Design a protein with these regions (language model features):
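Short coil/turn connectors at secondary-structure junctions
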Residues: 3-4, 91-92, 124-128
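Ser/Thr-glycine-rich phosphate-binding loops at phosphate-binding pockets of nucleotides
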Residues: 14-16, 136-137, 179
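A glycine- and small-aliphatic-rich helix-loop capping segment at beta-alpha/alpha-beta transitions
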Residues: 23, 76-79, 110-118, 144-149
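Short beta-strand-loop/turn "lid" adjacent to the catalytic site in phosphate-handling enzymes
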Residues: 52-96, 101-114, 130
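A polyampholytic, Gly/Pro-enriched intrinsically disordered region
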Residues: 102, 113-122, 173-177
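Conserved small/polar residues in nucleotide/adenosyl-binding loops
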Residues: 179-185
């Protein structure tokens, strides 16, 4: 039996990833990734992930806007409700975060060398914007210890500037979600 008390689940637009840890611990075990073809058997998946562990706490990171502790995904017919999951699986806690909200909270675990800035400047406060491509375009705003979740999604807003920055000259791309980007950096800030 796995002795970890926390299950972390990331449900993105394309893949689902999960790992086990303990609350307050930055290390993970049993990290897994699978293509996200269907979430029809979501309850069965969670049951299987909880079966051989002492997990009583789950944190979900899901692509989509969070409203009233629930997220309806932007690119598929799936909705997740943290309160219902906590009750259904008899959990102590079940937290639901927008995917880029999760990234925003994780930023302080990285060092300055892990980031590339779009524009060099002298910092004058603790606010910054984190953006990045995935199935859609994601972003979060960080102000001190607070993270403001966003949902840009599949959009062409700002696409000319992004294509210019990344030196993409083709008119073939008319939405960020159609662009697969490989960048020589670990993070974009």
């Amino acid at each position: 039996m796995l002795d970890k008390n926390l299950l972390l689940v990331d449900i993105g637009g394309t893949n689902i990833r999960y790992a086990y840890s303990n609350i307050g611990d930055l290390s993970f075990v049993s990290e897994n990734k699978a293509e996200l073809e269907s979430l029809n058997d979501f309850d069965n998946l969670i049951s299987e992930l909880l079966a051989n562990s002492v997990v009583k706490n789950i944190v979900f990171s899901v692509a989509g806007p969070r409203v009233n502790n629930s997220i309806k995904m932007t690119n598929r017919n799936f909705q997740i409700d943290a309160d219902a999951i906590r009750k259904r699986f008899n959990l102590e806690s079940c937290h639901l975060l927008n995917d880029w909200e999760s990234i925003g909270y994780s930023i302080k675990t990285f060092s300055e060398n892990d980031f590339d800035d779009f524009k060099e400047s002298e910092p004058f406060n603790e606010n910054f914007l984190v953006i990045g491509p995935g199935t859609g375009l994601g972003a979060s705003v960080i102000s001190g210890n607070n993270v403001i979740a966003t949902e840009i999604g599949n959009t062409n807003l700002g696409l000319p500037a992004l294509k210019s920055l990344l030196k993409i000259n083709s008119d073939e791309f008319n939405a960020v979600s159609y662009t697969h980007l490989t960048l020589p950096t670990k993070r974009i800030v």
